[in-house]
Swiss-Prot record:
This is Small ribosomal subunit protein uS10. GO terms for biological process: translation. PANTHER family: 30S RIBOSOMAL PROTEIN S10 FAMILY MEMBER. Involved in the binding of tRNA to the ribosomes. Belongs to the universal ribosomal protein uS10 family.
Length: 111
């Protein structure tokens, strides 16, 4: 068996992509597109890793005048995913730049 060469940590490259959105299906579809694009160009993938969902609740009065006890609650759930692309090539970076994602997905990329 051939031994794998270990590269020093400074020589390894990694792109970390964090996705955030309110719609879980849209977010999963976007992560699938990113993973498929990266694998097609020959990069190694770690993820998608589901991060904890944050839930923000808002309480409002149902009536503007009376009946303070009558309230209604709304919540916004923010779903998050993490993808690491290990040892990306120039093809990978170009393919990710041309990738179009839906409007409901926020993306942050760290190199």
């Amino acid at each position: 068996m051939a031994k794998q060469e270990k590269q020093p940590k400074s020589a390894r490259q990694k792109i970390r992509i964090r996705l955030k959105g309110y719609d879980q299906r849209l977010l999963d579809r976007s992560t699938g597109d990113i993973v498929e694009t990266a694998k097609r160009t020959g990069a190694a993938i770690a993820g998608p890793i589901p991060l904890p969902t944050s839930c923000e609740k808002f309480t409002v009065l149902r009536s503007p005048n009376i009946d303070r006890k009558s309230r209604e609650q709304f919540e916004i759930r923010t779903h998050r995913r993490l993808i690491d692309i290990l040892n990306p090539t120039s093809k990978t970076i170009d393919a990710l730049k041309t990738l179009t994602l839906p409007a409901g997905v926020d993306i942050k990329i760290k190199a």
